[in-house]
Regions:
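Charged alpha-helical initiation segments
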Residues: 1-38
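Hydrophobic packing residues in well-ordered alpha-helices of helical domains and bundles
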Residues: 7, 14, 38-41, 97, ...
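Amphipathic, well-ordered alpha-helical segments in soluble domains
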Residues: 13-24, 44, 51, 143, ...
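N-terminal interaction modules that seed assembly of large macromolecular complexes
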Residues: 23, 29-63
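Long, charged low-complexity segments
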Residues: 62-149
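Short acidic DE-rich linear segments
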Residues: 155-160
Length: 160
């Protein structure tokens, strides 16, 4: 299995995760009437985003456009500084991508969270409140879906 075949598999996997997240919000939530499903959708969106960022970093490193580091946070910083714009992510999109990563981290670290009115409320260790709404998660899905499409068009078209 070559590099581009593996890339295609990761793009497809990312797309499936986004579809799962969207299905959770649009289909499962109205039936189950449980806003905690938004947190599950956020996890799917974060996994999809992380897969795409990893793929972009590997591809850009292979093309010798960037340098990779052993530190994951440094590599994510490289993505935002040198790669995101190349893949069609403007300042607002990059802000949303960072928010996905931030909220996902807060969700994982949170000792206390609850759902109310189709929103998930997360309390962090510093007693700050973070809210994820249905509308917000759909916005996240849209941004990551756009990144997925741009990766598909950029990385996989370069093969031909």
């Amino acid at each position: 299995m070559g590099f581009y075949d593996k890339c295609a598999g990761e793009v497809i996997e990312s797309y499936k995760m986004l579809n799962d997240a969207e299905r959770i919000v649009k289909v499962a939530m109205p039936v189950a009437k449980d806003a905690k499903l938004i947190a599950r959708a956020l996890e799917k969106v974060h996994k999809s985003l992380f897969l795409l960022i990893s793929l972009i970093l590997k591809y850009e490193h292979m093309r010798k456009r960037i340098r990779l580091y052993k530190n994951k946070d440094k590599n994510v910083e490289v993505f935002y500084e040198k790669c995101a714009l190349r893949y069609g992510m403007d300042a607002e999109d990059r802000k949303m991508l960072k928010e996905i990563m931030f909220l996902s981290l807060k969700h994982k670290e949170s000792g206390f969270e609850f759902s109310k009115d189709n929103r998930v409320v997360i309390f962090d260790d510093n007693y700050k409140i973070h809210v994820i709404s249905e509308k917000g998660i759909m916005g996240f899905i849209g941004v990551v879906r756009r990144l997925n499409l741009n990766v598909k068009n950029g990385v996989l078209r370069a093969k031909n």
